[in-house]
Protein backbone atom coordinates (compact mmCIF):
# COMPACT_ATOMS: atom_id res chain seq x y z
CA UNK A 1 0.00 0.00 0.00
CA UNK A 2 3.02 2.31 -0.04
CA UNK A 3 2.51 2.84 -3.78
CA UNK A 4 6.25 3.07 -4.38
CA UNK A 5 6.51 6.35 -2.46
CA UNK A 6 9.72 6.82 -0.52
CA UNK A 7 7.86 8.56 2.29
CA UNK A 8 5.79 5.44 3.00
CA UNK A 9 8.65 2.97 2.71
CA UNK A 10 9.75 1.00 5.76
CA UNK A 11 12.75 2.61 7.46
CA UNK A 12 15.77 0.82 8.86
CA UNK A 13 14.87 1.67 12.45
CA UNK A 14 11.44 0.12 11.91
CA UNK A 15 13.03 -3.11 10.67
CA UNK A 16 15.32 -3.19 13.70
CA UNK A 17 12.31 -2.76 15.99
CA UNK A 18 10.51 -5.64 14.25
CA UNK A 19 13.52 -7.92 14.58
CA UNK A 20 14.17 -6.98 18.21
CA UNK A 21 10.56 -7.70 19.18
CA UNK A 22 10.45 -10.98 17.25
CA UNK A 23 7.61 -9.86 14.98
CA UNK A 24 8.99 -11.94 12.09
CA UNK A 25 8.87 -15.20 14.06
CA UNK A 26 5.70 -17.18 13.45
CA UNK A 27 4.63 -20.58 14.71
CA UNK A 28 5.35 -24.15 13.68
CA UNK A 29 1.91 -24.55 12.08
CA UNK A 30 0.79 -22.81 8.90
CA UNK A 31 -2.69 -21.97 7.70
CA UNK A 32 -3.13 -22.33 3.95
CA UNK A 33 -4.39 -18.74 3.63
CA UNK A 34 -1.27 -17.42 5.38
CA UNK A 35 1.19 -19.01 2.94
CA UNK A 36 1.39 -15.81 0.90
CA UNK A 37 2.90 -13.95 3.88
CA UNK A 38 5.64 -16.50 4.64
CA UNK A 39 9.25 -15.84 3.67
CA UNK A 40 11.00 -19.08 4.70
CA UNK A 41 10.94 -21.90 7.21
CA UNK A 42 13.73 -22.44 9.74
CA UNK A 43 15.35 -25.79 10.45
CA UNK A 44 13.49 -26.05 13.78
CA UNK A 45 10.13 -25.73 12.00
CA UNK A 46 9.37 -22.07 12.80
CA UNK A 47 8.02 -20.04 9.89
CA UNK A 48 9.52 -16.62 9.17
CA UNK A 49 7.07 -13.88 8.21
CA UNK A 50 7.88 -11.50 5.36
CA UNK A 51 8.16 -8.11 7.08
CA UNK A 52 7.61 -6.28 3.79
CA UNK A 53 4.13 -7.79 3.59
CA UNK A 54 3.61 -6.91 7.24
CA UNK A 55 4.44 -3.25 6.58
CA UNK A 56 2.17 -3.07 3.52
CA UNK A 57 -0.78 -4.50 5.43
CA UNK A 58 -0.04 -2.18 8.34
CA UNK A 59 -0.37 0.85 6.05
CA UNK A 60 -3.60 -0.55 4.57
CA UNK A 61 -5.07 -1.01 8.05
CA UNK A 62 -4.05 2.52 9.04
CA UNK A 63 -5.76 3.93 5.92
CA UNK A 64 -8.94 2.03 6.78
CA UNK A 65 -8.92 3.42 10.33
CA UNK A 66 -8.30 6.98 9.15
CA UNK A 67 -11.23 6.69 6.72
CA UNK A 68 -13.66 6.52 9.67
CA UNK A 69 -14.80 10.09 10.39
CA UNK A 70 -15.58 9.51 14.07
CA UNK A 71 -12.65 7.78 15.80
CA UNK A 72 -14.96 6.43 18.51
CA UNK A 73 -16.68 4.26 15.88
CA UNK A 74 -13.53 2.11 15.73
CA UNK A 75 -13.58 -0.74 18.28
CA UNK A 76 -10.26 -2.29 19.30
CA UNK A 77 -10.46 -5.60 21.15
CA UNK A 78 -8.05 -7.87 22.99
CA UNK A 79 -9.21 -10.69 25.24
CA UNK A 80 -5.66 -11.90 25.92
CA UNK A 81 -3.52 -10.25 28.58
CA UNK A 82 -0.61 -9.52 26.24
CA UNK A 83 -2.67 -7.08 24.19
CA UNK A 84 -4.90 -5.39 26.75
CA UNK A 85 -2.48 -2.64 27.72
CA UNK A 86 -1.62 -2.02 24.06
CA UNK A 87 -5.32 -1.75 23.16
CA UNK A 88 -5.93 0.81 25.90
CA UNK A 89 -2.90 2.86 24.85
CA UNK A 90 -3.97 2.72 21.20
CA UNK A 91 -7.45 3.91 22.11
CA UNK A 92 -6.05 6.77 24.18
CA UNK A 93 -3.81 7.88 21.31
CA UNK A 94 -6.30 7.59 18.44
CA UNK A 95 -9.67 8.06 20.15
CA UNK A 96 -10.95 4.55 19.45
CA UNK A 97 -13.24 2.54 21.74
CA UNK A 98 -11.33 -0.19 23.63
CA UNK A 99 -12.69 -3.53 24.84
CA UNK A 100 -9.99 -5.09 27.01
CA UNK A 101 -10.70 -8.43 28.62
CA UNK A 102 -13.68 -10.69 28.11
CA UNK A 103 -15.98 -9.75 25.24
CA UNK A 104 -19.63 -9.95 26.27
CA UNK A 105 -21.56 -11.99 23.69
CA UNK A 106 -24.28 -9.95 22.03
CA UNK A 107 -22.44 -6.63 22.24
CA UNK A 108 -22.86 -6.11 18.49
CA UNK A 109 -26.13 -8.02 17.96
CA UNK A 110 -28.32 -7.82 21.09
CA UNK A 111 -29.93 -4.37 21.19
CA UNK A 112 -31.52 -4.99 24.60
CA UNK A 113 -28.09 -5.30 26.18
CA UNK A 114 -26.74 -2.28 28.08
CA UNK A 115 -23.32 -2.66 26.43
CA UNK A 116 -24.76 -2.70 22.90
CA UNK A 117 -22.54 -0.96 20.35
CA UNK A 118 -22.62 -0.33 16.63
CA UNK A 119 -19.02 0.24 15.51
CA UNK A 120 -18.07 0.91 11.91
CA UNK A 121 -14.71 -0.88 12.11
CA UNK A 122 -13.33 -3.69 14.28
CA UNK A 123 -9.66 -4.34 15.11
CA UNK A 124 -8.76 -7.52 17.03
CA UNK A 125 -5.48 -8.84 18.40
CA UNK A 126 -5.91 -12.57 17.75
CA UNK A 127 -8.56 -14.09 15.43
CA UNK A 128 -8.51 -17.34 17.38
CA UNK A 129 -8.90 -15.80 20.84
CA UNK A 130 -11.27 -13.05 19.63
CA UNK A 131 -13.50 -15.30 17.53
CA UNK A 132 -16.72 -14.10 19.21
CA UNK A 133 -16.48 -10.43 18.13
CA UNK A 134 -15.40 -11.54 14.64
CA UNK A 135 -18.44 -13.79 14.32
CA UNK A 136 -20.82 -11.07 15.52
CA UNK A 137 -19.18 -8.55 13.19
CA UNK A 138 -19.99 -10.84 10.26
CA UNK A 139 -23.67 -10.78 11.29
CA UNK A 140 -23.92 -6.98 11.16
CA UNK A 141 -21.52 -6.35 8.24
CA UNK A 142 -18.68 -4.71 10.18
CA UNK A 143 -15.30 -4.72 8.39
CA UNK A 144 -12.55 -6.31 10.48
CA UNK A 145 -8.78 -5.97 10.88
CA UNK A 146 -6.76 -8.61 12.74
CA UNK A 147 -3.17 -9.30 13.78
CA UNK A 148 -2.66 -12.80 12.36
CA UNK A 149 0.01 -15.38 13.08
CA UNK A 150 1.00 -18.18 10.71
CA UNK A 151 -1.64 -20.52 12.15
CA UNK A 152 -4.47 -17.98 12.53
CA UNK A 153 -7.76 -18.68 10.70
CA UNK A 154 -8.69 -15.83 8.35
CA UNK A 155 -12.43 -16.47 8.42
CA UNK A 156 -14.39 -13.18 8.76
CA UNK A 157 -11.10 -11.23 8.60
CA UNK A 158 -11.00 -8.53 5.92
CA UNK A 159 -7.50 -7.11 6.49
CA UNK A 160 -4.94 -9.51 7.98
CA UNK A 161 -1.68 -8.07 9.31
CA UNK A 162 0.85 -10.94 9.41
CA UNK A 163 2.94 -10.82 12.58
CA UNK A 164 3.74 -12.66 15.78
CA UNK A 165 0.61 -12.12 17.89
CA UNK A 166 1.79 -14.35 20.76
CA UNK A 167 4.75 -12.43 22.17
CA UNK A 168 4.09 -9.48 24.45
CA UNK A 169 6.74 -7.32 22.80
CA UNK A 170 5.58 -8.12 19.28
CA UNK A 171 1.92 -7.37 20.04
CA UNK A 172 2.80 -4.11 21.79
CA UNK A 173 5.06 -3.03 18.94
CA UNK A 174 2.39 -3.75 16.30
CA UNK A 175 -0.21 -1.67 18.12
CA UNK A 176 2.38 1.10 18.57
CA UNK A 177 3.21 1.02 14.85
CA UNK A 178 -0.47 1.09 13.93
CA UNK A 179 -1.16 4.04 16.24
CA UNK A 180 1.83 5.93 14.86
CA UNK A 181 0.75 5.41 11.23
CA UNK A 182 -2.81 6.48 12.02
CA UNK A 183 -1.59 9.70 13.63
CA UNK A 184 0.79 10.33 10.73
CA UNK A 185 -1.95 9.89 8.14
CA UNK A 186 -4.24 12.19 10.10
CA UNK A 187 -1.50 14.80 10.19
CA UNK A 188 -1.29 14.83 13.98
CA UNK A 189 2.43 14.00 14.01
CA UNK A 190 5.10 14.54 11.37
CA UNK A 191 7.01 11.84 9.52
CA UNK A 192 10.18 13.90 9.71
CA UNK A 193 10.43 13.66 13.48
CA UNK A 194 10.26 10.50 15.61
CA UNK A 195 7.19 9.96 17.77
CA UNK A 196 7.90 10.91 21.38
CA UNK A 197 5.87 7.95 22.72
CA UNK A 198 8.05 4.89 23.32
CA UNK A 199 6.93 1.36 22.33
CA UNK A 200 7.63 0.23 25.91
CA UNK A 201 4.36 1.84 27.03
CA UNK A 202 2.44 -0.66 24.89
CA UNK A 203 4.20 -3.75 26.27
CA UNK A 204 2.41 -6.09 28.64
CA UNK A 205 3.93 -6.43 32.12
CA UNK A 206 3.20 -9.22 34.57
CA UNK A 207 1.78 -7.82 37.85
CA UNK A 208 3.93 -10.22 39.88
CA UNK A 209 7.07 -8.98 38.15
CA UNK A 210 6.04 -5.38 38.81
CA UNK A 211 5.59 -6.14 42.53
CA UNK A 212 8.97 -7.87 42.67
CA UNK A 213 10.65 -4.90 40.99
CA UNK A 214 8.98 -2.45 43.37
CA UNK A 215 10.02 -4.50 46.41
CA UNK A 216 13.59 -4.76 45.13
CA UNK A 217 13.70 -1.02 44.50
CA UNK A 218 12.35 -0.29 47.99
CA UNK A 219 14.88 -2.61 49.65
CA UNK A 220 17.68 -1.07 47.63
CA UNK A 221 16.62 2.42 48.67
CA UNK A 222 16.49 1.41 52.36
CA UNK A 223 19.95 -0.18 52.30
CA UNK A 224 21.33 2.83 50.48
CA UNK A 225 19.94 5.18 53.14
CA UNK A 226 21.41 3.03 55.95
CA UNK A 227 24.79 2.97 54.25
CA UNK A 228 24.77 6.72 53.81
CA UNK A 229 23.80 7.37 57.44
CA UNK A 230 26.53 5.07 58.77
CA UNK A 231 29.48 5.99 56.58
CA UNK A 232 28.71 9.24 54.88
CA UNK A 233 27.27 11.13 57.85
CA UNK A 234 28.90 14.58 58.09
CA UNK A 235 31.41 14.80 60.93
CA UNK A 236 30.83 17.53 63.55
CA UNK A 237 32.82 20.62 62.79
CA UNK A 238 35.67 21.25 65.24
CA UNK A 239 36.86 24.81 65.63
CA UNK A 240 40.08 25.27 67.58
CA UNK A 241 40.27 28.24 69.96
CA UNK A 242 42.33 31.12 68.65
CA UNK A 243 45.98 30.90 69.64
CA UNK A 244 47.70 34.04 70.88
CA UNK A 245 50.29 35.36 68.56
CA UNK A 246 53.82 35.32 69.99
CA UNK A 247 56.51 37.20 68.19
CA UNK A 248 59.39 36.01 70.35
CA UNK A 249 58.99 32.51 71.80
CA UNK A 250 61.72 33.12 74.42
CA UNK A 251 59.70 35.85 76.13
CA UNK A 252 56.73 33.57 76.84
CA UNK A 253 53.07 34.43 76.89
CA UNK A 254 51.73 37.04 79.26
CA UNK A 255 48.63 35.83 81.07
CA UNK A 256 46.04 38.61 81.37
CA UNK A 257 45.31 39.55 84.97
CA UNK A 258 41.72 39.14 86.15
CA UNK A 259 40.61 41.58 88.89
CA UNK A 260 39.37 39.93 92.09
CA UNK A 261 35.87 40.93 93.07
CA UNK A 262 35.64 42.32 96.62
CA UNK A 263 32.69 41.31 98.83
CA UNK A 264 31.66 43.30 101.98
CA UNK A 265 32.79 41.71 105.25
CA UNK A 266 30.88 41.70 108.52
CA UNK A 267 32.19 41.81 112.11
CA UNK A 268 30.53 38.96 113.93
CA UNK A 269 31.87 40.07 117.33
CA UNK A 270 30.11 43.44 117.09
CA UNK A 271 26.63 41.87 116.93
CA UNK A 272 24.89 41.40 120.34
CA UNK A 273 23.91 37.93 121.55
CA UNK A 274 20.20 37.41 120.99
CA UNK A 275 19.50 34.33 123.09
CA UNK A 276 20.72 32.63 126.24
CA UNK A 277 21.37 29.10 125.09
CA UNK A 278 21.78 27.67 128.64
CA UNK A 279 18.47 28.90 130.13
CA UNK A 280 15.91 27.56 127.65
CA UNK A 281 16.71 23.79 127.80
CA UNK A 282 16.47 23.59 131.63
CA UNK A 283 12.92 24.90 131.65
CA UNK A 284 11.86 22.31 129.14
CA UNK A 285 13.57 19.53 131.08
CA UNK A 286 11.65 20.26 134.29
CA UNK A 287 8.37 20.07 132.42
CA UNK A 288 9.17 16.64 130.93
CA UNK A 289 10.37 15.33 134.29
CA UNK A 290 7.09 16.27 135.91
CA UNK A 291 5.14 14.35 133.40
CA UNK A 292 7.38 11.33 133.88
CA UNK A 293 6.74 11.27 137.66
CA UNK A 294 3.00 11.33 137.07
CA UNK A 295 3.17 8.16 134.89
CA UNK A 296 5.20 6.35 137.45
Curated annotation (Swiss-Prot):
Sequence positions bearing N-acetylserine: 2
PTM remark: Acylated. Acylation may be a prerequisite for conversion of the monomeric 37 kDa laminin receptor precursor (37LRP) to the mature dimeric 67 kDa laminin receptor (67LR), and may provide a mechanism for membrane association. Cleaved by stromelysin-3 (ST3) at the cell surface. Cleavage by stromelysin-3 may be a mechanism to alter cell-extracellular matrix interactions.
Region ranges (Disordered): 267-296
Domain of life: Eukaryota
Cellular component GO terms, alphabetical: cytosolic small ribosomal subunit; nucleus; plasma membrane
Coiled-coil segments on the chain, per record: none
Residue span of region Laminin-binding: 161-180, 205-229, 243-296
UniProt-annotated location(s): Cell membrane; Cytoplasm; Nucleus
Gene Ontology molecular function, alphabetical: laminin binding; laminin receptor activity; structural constituent of ribosome
Residues with site note (Cleavage): 115-116, 133-134
The entry's keywords: Acetylation, Cell membrane, Cytoplasm, Membrane, Nucleus, Receptor, Repeat, Ribonucleoprotein, Ribosomal protein
[DE]-W-[ST] repeats: 230-232, 248-250, 267-269, 276-278, 294-296
More info: This protein appears to have acquired a second function as a laminin receptor specifically in the vertebrate lineage.
Subunit structure: Monomer (37LRP) and homodimer (67LR). Component of the small ribosomal subunit. Mature ribosomes consist of a small (40S) and a large (60S) subunit. The 40S subunit contains about 33 different proteins and 1 molecule of RNA (18S). The 60S subunit contains about 49 different proteins and 3 molecules of RNA (28S, 5.8S and 5S). Interacts with RPS21. Interacts with several laminins including at least LAMB1. Interacts with MDK.
Annotated family: Belongs to the universal ribosomal protein uS2 family.
Record function comment: Required for the assembly and/or stability of the 40S ribosomal subunit. Required for the processing of the 20S rRNA-precursor to mature 18S rRNA in a late step of the maturation of 40S ribosomal subunits. Also functions as a cell surface receptor for laminin. Plays a role in cell adhesion to the basement membrane and in the consequent activation of signaling transduction pathways. May play a role in cell fate determination and tissue morphogenesis.
UniProt-recorded name of the protein: Small ribosomal subunit protein uS2
Organism listed in the record: Taeniopygia guttata (Zebra finch)
Gene transcribed to yield this protein: RPSA
Amino acid sequence: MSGGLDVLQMKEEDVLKFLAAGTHLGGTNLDFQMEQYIYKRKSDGIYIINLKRTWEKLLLAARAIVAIENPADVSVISSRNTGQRAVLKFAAATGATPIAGRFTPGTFTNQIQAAFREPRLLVVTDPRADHQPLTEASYVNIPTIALCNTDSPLRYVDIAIPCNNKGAHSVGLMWWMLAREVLRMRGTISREHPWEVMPDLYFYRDPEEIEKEEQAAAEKAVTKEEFQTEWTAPAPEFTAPPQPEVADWSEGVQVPSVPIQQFPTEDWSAQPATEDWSAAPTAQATEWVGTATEWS
